[in-house]
């Protein structure tokens, strides 16, 4: 249950105030939000690799079965980051609606296609070898075109291949709506109203999910990902506009950040499905995540850390490559365990080794594939060629 990680905020496009009123630029990278982005991406990998160890790791704690919380964070953060990065540009007309959408799709689609092509080639090789260690049923060829086109969260069924990319598909729709959403948020003059607007959007989509699909929002099938992603994206946009209006105060932001963490941690021992209704768990967690995003976003980054910024930049690459890496690694590991007696301790070590391997692969992809490709595409996406 994963979600895309956004690229860095373009430093030339963050403008919360009219030109004449802009304060000196403050650092936006290397702070709390970047650290949270990195930690959430790691939680997503842990969630997806959790079933591959000697025993399912949710036995050690409910939090390891809750990848949807990291997904909620990323979807909300997507709206927040775009609001901070592109909000002013969409209002002033410096970037057109179509150009904005092309930039956003151009950021996520090429990398997605490359990883999907590598995955298809890998499956062909594994099928030719005759192994079933990669669980061939997960790779139905008739579902590949839908996923390649990034429309599999628009009601089309595609539950295999690079499964977490459903959130990219959903965000493509959110990107198309962003300029209108930001203009609507810009009309609100009292910043405290904005989080309430986001909460109402979530409530409306929760009602739709229950009446039409008979599930709570986090439990929707991935093919209905747009319904799940849109309210969280809207809430992120609303929080970004509130921060641009310098709300709340820095003191209140610290309280929100700490209080959000405390509430989120306090909810984790609860069994979500043992409660009378999933909302008893979902609403406090959503409130906590929103408080964390708002609090961390409002606080200035006074001591940016380069390692945090670089780690956050890897989050998108980690998101789109970890399933591909997992297919290779876990196919080999499970085949090895089937053929050679390996103690439980060594099996746990092999499980732990999967995380630095996934991070290393993400770094290679980011450094030698995704970033060079983005550098090549940038002039066209910016309309300079």
Where are these regions (language model features)?
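Conserved beta-strand->loop/alpha-helix structural units within folded catalytic cores of enzymes
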Residues: 38-41, 78, 104, 111-113, ...
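Membrane interfacial helix-start motif at the N-side
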Residues: 106, 110, 312-315
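Alpha-helical transmembrane segments and their helix-entry boundary regions
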Residues: 33, 100, 108, 167-168, ...
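Central hydrophobic cores of alpha-helical transmembrane segments
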Residues: 193-203, 254-263
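Alpha-helical transmembrane segments in multi-pass integral membrane proteins
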Residues: 5-10, 14-32, 39-42, 46-67, ...
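Membrane-interface helix-loop-helix regions
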Residues: 97-98, 102, 108-170, 203-219, ...
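His/acidic/aromatic-lined binding-pocket segments of jelly-roll/cupin-type domains
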Residues: 72-74, 231
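Hydrophobic alpha-helical transmembrane segments
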Residues: 101, 109, 113, 192-196, ...
């Amino acid at each position: 249950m994963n979600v895309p990680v956004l690229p860095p905020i373009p430093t030339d496009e963050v403008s919360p105030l009219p030109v004449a009123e802009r304060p000196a630029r403050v650092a936006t990278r290397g702070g709390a939000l970047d650290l949270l982005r990195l930690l959430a991406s790691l939680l997503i990998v842990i969630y997806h690799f959790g079933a591959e160890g000697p025993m399912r790791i949710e036995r050690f704690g409910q939090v390891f079965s809750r990848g949807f919380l990291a997904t909620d964070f990323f979807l909300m953060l997507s709206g927040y980051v775009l609001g901070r990065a592109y909000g002013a540009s969409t209002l002033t007309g410096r970037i057109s609606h179509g150009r904005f959408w092309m930039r956003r799709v151009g950021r996520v689609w090429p990398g997605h296609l490359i990883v999907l092509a590598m995955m298809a080639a890998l499956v062909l090789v594994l099928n030719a070898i005759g192994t079933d260690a990669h669980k061939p049923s997960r790779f139905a060829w008739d579902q590949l075109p839908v996923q390649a086109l990034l429309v599999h969260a628009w009601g089309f069924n595609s539950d295999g291949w690079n499964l977490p990319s459903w959130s990219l598909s959903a965000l493509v729709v959110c990107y198309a709506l962003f300029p209108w959403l930001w203009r609507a948020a810009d009309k609100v003059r009292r910043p405290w109203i904005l989080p309430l607007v986001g909460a109402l959007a979530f409530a409306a989509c929760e009602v739709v999910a229950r009446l039409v699909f008979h599930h709570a929002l986090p439990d929707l099938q991935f093919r209905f990902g747009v319904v799940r992603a849109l309210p969280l994206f809207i809430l992120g946009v609303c929080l970004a506009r509130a921060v641009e209006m310098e709300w709340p105060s820095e003191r209140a932001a610290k309280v929100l950040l700490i209080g959000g963490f405390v509430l989120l941690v306090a909810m984790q021992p609860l069994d979500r499905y043992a409660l009378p209704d999933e909302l008893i768990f979902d609403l406090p967690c959503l409130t906590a995540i929103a408080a964390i995003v708002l609090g961390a976003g409002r606080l200035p980054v006074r001591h940016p850390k380069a390692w945090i910024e670089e780690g956050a930049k890897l989050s998108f690459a980690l998101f789109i490559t970890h399933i591909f890496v997992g297919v290779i690694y876990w196919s080999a590991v499970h085949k090895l365990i089937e053929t050679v007696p390996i103690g439980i301790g060594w099996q746990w070590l092999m499980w732990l080794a999967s995380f630095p391997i996934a991070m290393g692969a993400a770094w290679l992809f980011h450094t030698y594939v995704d970033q060079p490709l983005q550098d090549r595409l940038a002039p066209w996406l910016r309309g300079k060629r």
